[in-house]
């Protein structure tokens, strides 16, 4: 990088400018008027080289002078009006420490690094289109001087992939972190790689989105549901299934002992049930769980007075406990405040899934459940979109005003025993709910924590 700068000076393609930053800005001109040559533009290469080495050796103050490329101050492309390529800045570098007090500018370092790393196609977004003439000019000069070899990298521009309900500005994302609107850069609601990974997004799902979105010179917006759809598609064939009750209420089966029997101690026997780990991959085997006289069900699966089209539990209605028996609801218990505290039912004999005659009784509703005897308590974090507006910062508006107050809801759930072996980053489909991942930071076998990656359906499309 430094050798290239010295070459540009000796070849007459660069000079040291001692104007202030404000003078350089004013004299660069704008789209309506050409720039004005610096009074230092026509120094000899020898004098410029001496000055540049003084900059390198710490002989001048920060901001007192810069190295600029000598191109064309009347160019209609402002990027070609003698851009700054080196400046004085006394700041430690994470690799070289205090060895250097001059540093190259990004626009100068970028094409050189591409060439040194043998990049053939430098891909960037449309805002860099006006930078391409400078990119090509610099590489051509360095090839002429023998510092780089032909052919040079080629820069190609395409439109940015904009997702609705997402911001990608680093400054605005930093504001979310530092204002404690999120828990950190790896918060599962953040569009950072660490955030997406913690949310449960897979590399395959992100690649699939990029492939489907394609590249274009025209800017546009991709709906966030497209990303969610790609994740569902990639997880559908690989995610093991499990049952989980996110808002548990106890279901008490009053005739359990009479139908299933009791053990030697007079306690109701447990009935072992099983289900495939994955419905389309029998080679993965089956998972085991027990049903007893008490099981956990979703509070929303019971209505004392059902609405039209409600086919789950209400007094007098029959449903199937998935992978288990058919039951008939007989009523409920309530607390002093009138809230339902338990649901009551009776077991219909000879209806266990997979047994002869189990389908003799037809039901319209099938609900998931977890046994009281072997269910595991777990923290479940229900994540949603971070913003309520498709374009939170459109038109320069305050993006914080459209933060979604319901973007995170934490519930205490009960999950089936097969999840006792879940490890951080393991992904599952919780039947009827969606795809979940064991949190890579907080999950332990002793204290399970699962994050909602994506629901089974797009709820925002309603």
Where are these regions (language model features)?
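Basic, alpha-helical terminal appendages of large translation-related enzymes
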Residues: 2-3, 10-19, 61, 183, ...
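Active-site cores that bind ATP or allylic diphosphates and position pyrophosphate for catalysis
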Residues: 3, 7-173, 231, 240, ...
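Short, compositionally biased low-complexity segments
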Residues: 23-29, 108-111, 178, 198-210
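Flexible, glycine-rich loop/tail regions that form catalytic "lids" or insertion modules at the edges
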Residues: 75-79, 149-197, 202, 207, ...
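Short hydrophobic "helix-edge" motifs at membrane interfaces and signal-peptide entry regions
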Residues: 96-98, 190-193, 422
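Glycine- and acidic
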Residues: 115-123, 187-193, 211-216
């Amino acid at each position: 990088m430094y050798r290239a700068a010295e070459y540009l000076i000796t070849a007459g393609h660069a000079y040291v400018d001692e104007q202030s930053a404000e003078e350089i800005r004013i004299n660069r001109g704008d789209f309506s008027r050409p720039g004005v040559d610096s009074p230092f533009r026509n120094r000899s290469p020898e004098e410029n080289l001496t000055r540049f080495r003084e900059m390198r050796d710490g002989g001048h103050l920060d901001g007192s002078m810069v190295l600029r490329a000598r191109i064309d101050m009347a160019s209609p492309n402002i990027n070609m009006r003698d851009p700054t390529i080196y400046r004085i800045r006394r700041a430690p570098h994470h690799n070289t420490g205090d060895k250097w007090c001059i540093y190259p500018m990004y626009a100068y370092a970028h094409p050189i690094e591409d060439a040194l790393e043998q990049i053939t196609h430098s891909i960037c977004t449309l805002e860099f289109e006006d930078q391409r003439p400078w990119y090509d000019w610099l590489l051509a000069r360095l090839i002429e001087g023998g510092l780089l070899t032909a052919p040079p990298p080629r820069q190609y521009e395409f439109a940015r992939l904009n997702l609705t309900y997402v911001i990608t500005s680093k400054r605005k994302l930093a504001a979310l972190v530092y204002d404690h609107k999120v828990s950190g850069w790896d918060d599962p609601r953040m569009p950072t790689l660490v955030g997406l990974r913690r949310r449960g997004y897979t590399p395959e799902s992100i690649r699939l989105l990029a492939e489907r979105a394609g590249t274009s010179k025209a800017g546009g917006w991709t709906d966030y549901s497209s990303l969610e759809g790609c994740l569902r598609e990639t997880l559908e064939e690989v995610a093991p299934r499990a049952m989980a009750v996110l808002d548990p209420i106890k279901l008490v089966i009053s005739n359990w002992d009479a139908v299933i029997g009791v053990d030697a101690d007079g306690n109701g026997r447990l009935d072992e049930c099983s289900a495939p780990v994955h419905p389309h991959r029998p080679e993965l085997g089956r998972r085991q769980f027990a049903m007893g006289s008490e099981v956990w069900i979703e509070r929303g699966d019971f209505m004392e007075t059902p609405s039209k089209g409600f086919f789950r539990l209400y007094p007098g209605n029959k449903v199937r406990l998935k992978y288990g028996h058919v039951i008939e609801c007989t009523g409920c218990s309530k607390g002093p405040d009138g809230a339902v505290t338990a649901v009551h039912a009776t077991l219909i004999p000879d209806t266990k899934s997979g047994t002869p005659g189990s389908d003799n009784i037809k039901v319209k509703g099938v609900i998931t459940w977890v046994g009281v005897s072997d269910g595991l308590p777990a923290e479940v974090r229900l994540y949603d979109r971070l913003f309520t507006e498709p374009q939170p910062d459109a038109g320069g508006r305050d993006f914080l005003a459209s933060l979604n107050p319901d973007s995170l809801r934490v519930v205490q759930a009960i999950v089936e025993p097969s999840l006792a072996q879940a490890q951080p980053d393991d992904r599952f489909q919780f039947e009827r709910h969606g795809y979940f991942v064991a949190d890579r930071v907080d999950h332990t076998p002793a204290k399970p924590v699962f994050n909602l990656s994506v629901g089974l359906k797009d709820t925002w499309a309603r």
